[in-house]
Every structure is written in C-alpha cells, then in structure tokens.
Amino acid sequence: MGHSICALIVGEPFDERAAREWDVVGLPVGQGLRLVHFSHYYTVYMQARRGETATLDVPADFPGIFPREAVVAGLAAALSGDVLSEAVAPFAVVLTDYFGGVGDQWACAFVAGRRVKAVRDINAALRVMGVQAAAGLDEFDTLGLARHRRTPDHLARYEDLCDGLGL
C-alpha cells in the first residue's frame, strides 16, 4: 500500500470558517496540530486566483510538485487566525511518495515567516512544530500520519481548474 500525500501542518486554534473559505479540512492529529491536505494544483490555482506571484523559500532540489507558492503562507495564517496580526504562526509543508516501503519524503518548516533551513524531512518539521515523540516511536508515527495515505479525491478538481486557467 502506498503513501502519497501533500499537506500543510498547522497548530491550533484552528479557524474552521477560514478552512471553509479556502476549501480545506483540518484533521486533528494530536499534540495541538491539524493536518490539511492540499496539492500542487490546489496551491497553483489559489495563487493565481488571489493574484499572488511570490514563492516560498523551498530547497531547489525538492521535486516540482512540492508547493512553492507563497499562498501557502497565507493559507496557514488564515487557518491559524493570524491574518490581521503581526504574529506569524509556525507551519510545515510535507510531501510523501512511497509504495511498498520504497520512496521518499520532503518537508519544510516555517517559523516567524522564515524557513528553518535544517529541516528537510517530516520528523524534523514535526519537531519544529513541537511534536514530542512517544516512547519507541518517531514523530510521524506518534501523530499517526501513516493513516493518512493519500490526498482526498475532492482535491482532484483543482487539476481541471488549473487547466481551465491555462496554468
């Protein structure tokens, strides 16, 4: 069974109204965090729809489908209720691509609007987000992220929406 997700991880409190406005769902995963599935198509579409052009600071060697659109930071701020405040809540972006135990993962963590340069994997990103691993488990397994194996089907429509905009 594969594991292929792209997601935003944000802390609580979580703004459910903002989640509806952004067409996302925040799944509680424990330790005060929410997992928000999205996709590269989702971020490209939202970036275009909002007229944004800025990019996130993402390592150049990350795959092309790793979200680089700065709209991700806006989404994280909205979900955290930080849109009108000067505080910028930490957030992480994670991507997995595994099948049969073979594959890879990528992650970035952002604190105060800046990427934590040392973070390149999910466990490191989760540590930045404050996750304390349970005895005998890593951070990923502590939160049960293996249960979230693929991007939900409702996000597939963003591929067509991007095509419709010529993106």
Model-derived features: positions:
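Charged interaction segments
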Residues: 31-33, 37-167
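Short, extreme N-terminal segment that most often corresponds to the first beta-strand
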Residues: 1-30
